[in-house]
């Protein structure tokens, strides 16, 4: 593989609260997942983040989440597939309008947090979300956890998909991410994160917390924009990729 997408979750500030490192991380990524007001973000932050993405020629993506600002969208909420569909259509629509007003357009959609993790393991919810994306714009790329129900649902709906891997998270033997509540869920060393990503890209494998290797399809790499090491990770990772002849560009264009 000679090209890979680097994405980051951004636009997660709201009101008087500043979250993340959007301005500093934007030069190192190729696609931005912008919060749409439910788990984080607001109209002003969305507009500013779209403008920043356009300035850096970064692909604009909607990052719809559960309506849970207090929990940052990382707490499970029992929703039906129909509710999932409606939440996603609503949030894509909000960012679509803000992007269009500035001469931009949406490139992709990536669910956030608990919505992402719930749908990755729930085919009915994953299909509802994928259908929501398709019904808004069948040309949008659908980002989802590699090997999960999200990718299967995106393909079934007729969407282009981008299988996502994580630079700053560890993996379990079934290919799932280690729960944030578990020990060693996060990778805090930039060199370790870069080594994990390079192996996923070059060998299609990742070492799990159980000490085994599992196969993984890496088409887009996430660096969490709210992490303490986000900017250092992005700078280190982009440099390592380029040194190995791997171009950074938006996923599945």
From Swiss-Prot:
It is an enzyme of class 3 (hydrolase). It catalyses: 5-oxo-L-proline + ATP + 2 H2O = L-glutamate + ADP + phosphate + H(+). GO terms for biological process: carbohydrate metabolic process. CDD domains: LamB_YcsF_like (cd10787). It holds the Pfam family LamB_YcsF. The keyword Cell wall biogenesis/degradation does not apply. Its EC number is 3.5.2.9. GO terms for molecular function: 5-oxoprolinase (ATP-hydrolyzing) activity; ATP binding. Keywords: ATP-binding, Hydrolase, Nucleotide-binding. It comes from the Bacteria. InterPro entries: Glyco_hydro/deAcase_b/a-brl (IPR011330), LamB/YcsF/PxpA-like (IPR005501). Belongs to the LamB/PxpA family. NCBIfam families: PRK05406.1-3 (NF003814), PRK05406.1-5 (NF003816). Catalyzes the cleavage of 5-oxoproline to form L-glutamate coupled to the hydrolysis of ATP to ADP and inorganic phosphate. Forms a complex composed of PxpA, PxpB and PxpC. This is 5-oxoprolinase subunit A. It comes from Shouchella clausii (strain KSM-K16) (Alkalihalobacillus clausii). The lineage of its organism: Bacteria, Bacillati, Bacillota, Bacilli, Bacillales.
């Amino acid at each position: 593989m000679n090209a890979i997408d680097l994405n980051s979750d951004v636009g997660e500030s709201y009101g008087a609260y500043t979250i993340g490192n959007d301005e500093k991380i934007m030069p190192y990524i190729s696609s931005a997942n912008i919060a749409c007001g439910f788990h984080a973000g607001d109209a002003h932050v969305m507009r500013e983040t779209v403008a920043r993405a356009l300035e850096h020629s970064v692909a604009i993506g909607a990052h719809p989440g559960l309506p849970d600002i207090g929990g940052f969208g990382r707490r499970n909420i029992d929703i039906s597939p129909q509710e999932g569909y409606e939440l996603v259509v609503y949030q894509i629509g909000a960012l679509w309008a803000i992007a269009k007003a500035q001469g931009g357009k949406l490139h992709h959609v990536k669910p956030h947090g608990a919505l992402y993790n719930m749908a990755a393991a729930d085919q009915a919810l994953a299909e509802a979300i994928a259908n929501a994306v398709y019904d808004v714009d069948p040309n949008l790329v659908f980002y989802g956890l590699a090997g999960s129900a999200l990718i299967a649902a995106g393909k079934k709906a007729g969407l282009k998909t981008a299988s996502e891997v994580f630079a700053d998270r560890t993996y379990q033997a079934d290919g799932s991410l280690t729960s944030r509540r578990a020990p060693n869920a996060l990778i805090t060393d930039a060199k370790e994160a870069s080594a994990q990503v390079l192996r996923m890209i070059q060998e299609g494998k990742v070492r799990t917390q159980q000490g085994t290797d599992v196969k993984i399809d890496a088409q887009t790499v996430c660096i969490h924009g709210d992490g303490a090491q986000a900017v250092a990770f992005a700078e280190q990772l982009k440099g390592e990729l380029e040194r190995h002849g791997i171009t950074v560009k938006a996923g599945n264009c």
